[in-house]
Amino acid sequence: MNETNNTSLLPVSSLPSGLLPVGFSCTVEKFSVTVKRYLAEGGFSHVYLVQLVFPGKPPFEAVLKRIFATDAMALRAVHEEVRTMKLVSNQKRCVSYYGSEFFRTSKNQFEVLVLLEYCPCGGLIDFLNTRLQVRLSEQEILKIASDVTEAVAVMHYLKPPLIHRDLKIENVLLAAPNSYKLCDFGSACHPIPGAKTAAEAKQLEYDIEKFTTWQYRCPEMINVHKGFGIDEKSDIWALGVLFYKLCYYTTPFEHQGLAAIMNVSYAFPTFPPYSDRLKRLISTLLQQYPWQRPNIYQTFCEICKMRNVPIHIYDIYNGKNVSSCNPSGSEYLQHASKLENSGIHQSKSSVFPQPASAMKPMASPMLPNVNSMPYLSNGDHNNNGNTSSPVSRFSYGQHTSNVPSTQKLPSNFRVTQGAPPSHTYGPPPPVQPKPKISPTTPRLSTLALADDMFSSTAKETVPTNEAVFTGDVKSFDSQESNIIESEPLSASNASGKPRTSVNRLVDRYNHTSSLNKVAAAPAPVPKPVNLKSVENPQNNISAPTPSSLQSSNAPVGLGEVESKSVPPTNMATERGVVGRRASMSIAVNARRVSKPEKEHTNPNAEQGDVIPEKPMSIKERMNMLMTKTDYEKPKVEGYGRYTDVQQTKK
């Protein structure tokens, strides 16, 4: 192996580009290599079956892996994979490593030749495809689980430990029938501490996305902002997913996605049937938090107990369920309290575990015992304040989390059985009485608000039994003021019922309408004598009188113009509008001058007589306003927008 940190010292590659032809020979370290056939292709590699010749030994078959590194970072990753394979090469449950060579193809491109053990029986995924009709038995599953767990234990037992990070069915090979080996150590690394800054979290997410498969990712890989590190417990979770797929040929979170992984939401199918003990083993491995999962020794012991075979590895954990980066037992409480106040967490619910239910202890005494749980979550207390007793949480087709741990909680964290945890707080602050707020002005009734809205600027004077409003009346005409002052009060209430705003409004309207009839009645017109045509003066448009609205060729009497001129007061009260709305009506009528209004004539009256418009009642006026038939927005500009719709339709 010519591994070196200085890439410029690497020899230039003499290998042909593309696929290596059959019979091609080269030298890798002390082995003479001859290509026999092409096997497979990876993302940046080609795999060949070759024959090795070593001095003093008979030829044997091996695998040549030709890896292409497109930059220095990729070359460094290949270096790490080769070093990992050297560490685990002598173990019978891992694929053996024979040698490697590094070459330089250009300034920034490299290629590496790696010799590995050849497994003639293919991969585990190929073996599962041959058993689609007849599924694996429980003993076959336990044999595969035992070999893979032993291979992972070899990595976890190193100092410092290595984590595989990409445990899956595709990375298990069959060296011989009923003999399985773990391969593909390109994703292996040492334990990674939890991210403390946003930059560290972003880098950790990038590594997880690059070196792991999402179906086998643990919850702390999905959400790195929780602050949990990536250590041996991530491999424990991946083993649980792998065992589940051996049973049911699918991963537990295949269809639900990443959210199901975060919530540990999955179910056990009813077919094929397996023992409750095997399902409890899978459930123990698939725990939400790292400290809830067993270590690799506890997992291997349980599998050996189920297979009824001796345990041939020793316990380096001394009976403790610990890991490199994540706390266990009571240490988790202190760890969670620190993470709660850090800037990485998004919410309190992302720190503390979900309410969990208890699980029956497994047969192996080395696995976590639920009777010594480190603490009880809020969901473990019933409504009566008593803690729920440990019951079996397993049932077909369902899954709930359990809280396994071998660590005992310190006395200051223990919860008294039979009563929920109590907290001591200081005396509550005295309750300050709310100050009473008295309104500066009384609330107005609905009718009063309507009157105020329809008035111009000030509140309209309404005759009542109370004192008459004596505000500013300078804007009123003298005639209007006399009408209002001489208006009789509605004191004669024959019915004896209380007068309302509507009754007072009706009385006022009827009274003013009768006065308007007298004031608007035209003077007696003498018979026209010595009629002659008089042109209508053009400068007379400023006075909106009926005479100015007549045709210029119409014959009128000399004294008729003065008699037919209606004073502004009568115009303001033309429809019974009184009070301060008179000034508004005058302004509106002034804008109607340019467009003549249709006169109401009596067929029996003499020519030139003008019949005053019939006053409109409140009911008719309100109906017109509610049905919006009074005026509508015209399609023309100018003064035509004020055209009466009813007259236009005629």
UniProtKB/Swiss-Prot annotation:
Name by which UniProt lists this protein: Protein kinase domain-containing protein ppk38
Gene3D superfamilies from the UniProt entry: Transferase(Phosphotransferase) domain 1
Gene Ontology cellular-component terms listed: actin cortical patch; cytoplasm
InterPro entries: Kinase-like_dom_sf, Prot_kinase_dom, Ser/Thr_kinase_AS
Domain notes: The protein kinase domain is predicted to be catalytically inactive.
Regions of compositional bias (Polar residues) in chain numbering: 369-415, 533-554
Organism: Schizosaccharomyces pombe (strain 972 / ATCC 24843)
Domain Protein kinase positions: 33-315
Gene Ontology terms, MF aspect: ATP binding; protein serine/threonine kinase activity
Pfam family, one: Pkinase
GO BP terms, alphabetized: actin cortical patch assembly; actin filament organization; regulation of clathrin-dependent endocytosis; signaling
Region (Disordered) residue spans: 344-442, 517-571, 591-616
Signal peptide: none
Domain of life assignment: Eukaryota
PROSITE patterns: PROTEIN_KINASE_DOM, PROTEIN_KINASE_ST
The entry's keywords: Nucleotide-binding
